[in-house]
């Protein structure tokens, strides 16, 4: 990657200002943000210069704005995907201290600020995304509640703080995607706050609003009374998305741990559902026992009443037989009255007998239902025990995998240390080899000199021998 500032003999104030401005917008203009699988890639653009040329060339503003929109959209994709995956793996309600959630709000803030028109005030120009968010309550009546809540928060003093609080409340309400879609569909209202080529006015804004639907599966809870939203600095942390070269070593072990964690969470959720079902069945059994007790009491009362009616019937039969005997000699009119009384008594007895049969039938149904509920409870308790055993086994496997991962990491560190020692030994051997090669060269040179001297002495000796002869 090339340096941000080219070497110059003497830095000038103009060069420093231009370099500083370029460094502040480096993530939007100097690089193109793209995704490689699940990772973030920053690619340098060769056609952007950070120092003024002798004859400055004007960059196309539409191209730069389109590049910024694409970068912000890719960052939003990565942030939303990472937030959903980490939240589901975490398996609990998120709070304001959760790092992926903080980065998501920072990315959303940058998206809402892109192409924002500056408002002139007494203190100068001011850019705030609180104005567009206030429009949502006019488009979606449900948003009026969170807008009023934001305005009532005592610790918020700036429009930026109100906008940040609004985003957090909308996420808690699980309506952020709906609100953003309603806002983006009203571009005639957004044109008052944004430039024509801003992210909220283009297709990238609609894509981000669609991606926000996935956040409805996340449960978040924020306490904004003690949180300083006015003075927070919204800086995107690229280190959360950049790919680490050494991260692929433990991918397989991490994948196994993730799979076991998913199984563990599934079994725990299933166990909670089974416990809830057992509690519901227990409540139904209790209600059936109370109903059974009540019906048993009613049956006893009905039996007593039937016995009383049978005794009364016997007494009426005796009286009727006595009356018949006595009325054989009496007037015919008295016999007719006694017959009517007897028929009424028989009718009353028939009704009471039918009532008793109905009560006994209902009691038998309640008893059979109770037996079925007890059988279902036993089966559910057996299923719960099996799931708990499976959960214990999965936890043991998770502990074993974690121990294996630590052992592999220790072995990897040991192997790295051994490789380092071998490389140092190799370098020392190479150094000794070079020294020995130099020594051999010196010895060869000395040998050549000795051979030369021997030849000289031999020739001198040959010259001296003839002279003696």
UniProtKB/Swiss-Prot annotation:
Q: Which InterPro entries match?
A: RUFY1-3, Run_dom, Run_dom_sf, RUN_RUFY3
Q: Which Pfam family, any one of them, does this sequence belong to?
A: RUN
Q: Which GO terms describe its cellular component?
A: anchoring junction; axon; cytoplasm; dendrite; endolysosome; filopodium; growth cone; lamellipodium
The question of whether Membrane is a record keyword is answered with yes
- UniProt domain RUN: residue ranges: 95-227
The superkingdom listed in its UniProt entry is Eukaryota
Q: Provide the primary localization.
A: cytoplasm
GO terms under biological process? actin filament organization; cell differentiation; negative regulation of axonogenesis; nervous system development; positive regulation of axon extension; positive regulation of cell migration; positive regulation of intracellular protein transport; positive regulation of retrograde axon cargo transport
Q: Where in the cell is it found?
A: Cytoplasm; Endomembrane system; Cell projection, Invadopodium; Cell projection, Growth cone
Q: What does this protein do?
A: ARL8 effector that promotes the coupling of endolysosomes to dynein-dynactin for retrograde transport along microtubules. Acts by binding both GTP-bound ARL8 and dynein-dynactin. In nonneuronal cells, promotes concentration of endolysosomes in the juxtanuclear area. In hippocampal neurons, drives retrograde transport of endolysosomes from the axon to the soma. Plays a role in the generation of neuronal polarity formation and axon growth. Implicated in the formation of a single axon by developing neurons.
Subunit structure of this entry?
Interacts with PAK1. Interacts (via C-terminus) with Ras-related Rab-5 proteins. Interacts (via C-terminus) with Ras-related Rap-2 proteins. Interacts with PIK3CA and PIK3R1. Interacts (via N-terminus) with FSCN1; this interaction induces neuron axon development. Interacts with DBN1. Interacts (via the second coiled coil) with GTP-, but not GDP-bound ARL8A and ARL8B. Interacts with dynactin/DCTN1 and the dynein intermediate chain DYNC1I1/2. Directly interacts with DYNC1LI1.
What's the domain remark here?
The second coiled coil domain is involved in the interaction with GTP-bound ARL8B.
Q: What is this protein called?
A: Protein RUFY3
Source organism of the structure: Pongo abelii
């Amino acid at each position: 990657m090339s340096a941000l500032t080219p070497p110059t003999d003497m830095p000038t104030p103009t060069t420093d200002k231009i370099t500083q401005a370029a460094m502040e917008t480096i993530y939007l203009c100097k690089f193109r943000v793209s995704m490689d699988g699940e990772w973030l890639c920053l690619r340098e653009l060769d056609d952007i210069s950070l120092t003024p040329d002798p004859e400055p060339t004007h960059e196309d503003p539409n191209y730069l704005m389109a590049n910024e929109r694409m970068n912000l959209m890719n960052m939003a994709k990565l942030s939303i995907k990472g937030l959903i995956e980490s939240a589901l793996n975490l398996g609990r309600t998120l709070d304001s201290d959760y790092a992926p959630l903080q980065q998501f709000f920072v990315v959303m803030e940058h998206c809402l600020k892109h192409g924002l028109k500056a408002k002139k005030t007494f203190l100068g120009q001011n850019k705030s995304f609180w104005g567009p968010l206030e429009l949502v309550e006019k488009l979606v009546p449900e948003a009026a509640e969170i807008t009023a809540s934001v305005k009532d928060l005592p610790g918020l003093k700036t429009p930026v703080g109100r906008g940040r609080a609004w985003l957090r409340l909308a996420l808690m309400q699980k309506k952020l995607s709906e609100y953003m879609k309603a806002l983006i569909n009203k571009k005639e209202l957004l044109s008052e706050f944004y430039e024509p080529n801003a992210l909220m006015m283009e297709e990238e804004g609609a894509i981000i609003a669609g991606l926000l639907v996935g956040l409805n599966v996340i449960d978040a809870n924020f306490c904004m009374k003690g949180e300083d939203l006015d003075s927070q600095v919204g800086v995107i942390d690229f280190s959360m998305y950049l790919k680490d070269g050494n991260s692929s070593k433990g991918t397989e072990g991490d994948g196994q741990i993730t799979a076991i964690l998913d199984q563990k969470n599934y079994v725990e959720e299933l166990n909670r559902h089974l416990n809830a079902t057992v509690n519901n069945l227990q409540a139904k059994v209790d209600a059936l026992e109370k109903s059974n007790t009540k019906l048993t009491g009613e049956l006893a009362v009905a039996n007593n009443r039937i016995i009383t009616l049978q005794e009364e019937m016997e007494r009426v039969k005796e009286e009727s037989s006595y009356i018949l005997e006595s009325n054989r000699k009496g007037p015919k009119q008295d016999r007719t009255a006694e017959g009517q009384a007897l028929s009424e008594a028989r009718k009353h007895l028939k009704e009471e007998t039918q009532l008793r049969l109905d009560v006994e039938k209902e009691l038998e149904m309640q008893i059979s239902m109770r037996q079925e509920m007890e059988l279902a409870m036993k089966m559910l308790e057996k299923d719960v025990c099996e799931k708990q055993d499976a959960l214990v086994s999965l936890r043991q496997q998770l502990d074993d995998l974690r121990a294996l991962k630590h052992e592999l990491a220790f072995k990897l560190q040991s192997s790295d240390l051994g490789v380092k020692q071998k490389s140092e030994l190799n370098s020392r051997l190479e150094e000794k080899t070079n020294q020995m090669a130099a020594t051999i060269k010196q010895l060869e040179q000395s040998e050549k000199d000795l051979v030369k001297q021997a030849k000289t002495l031999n020739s001198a000796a040959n010259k001296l021998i003839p002279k003696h002869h």
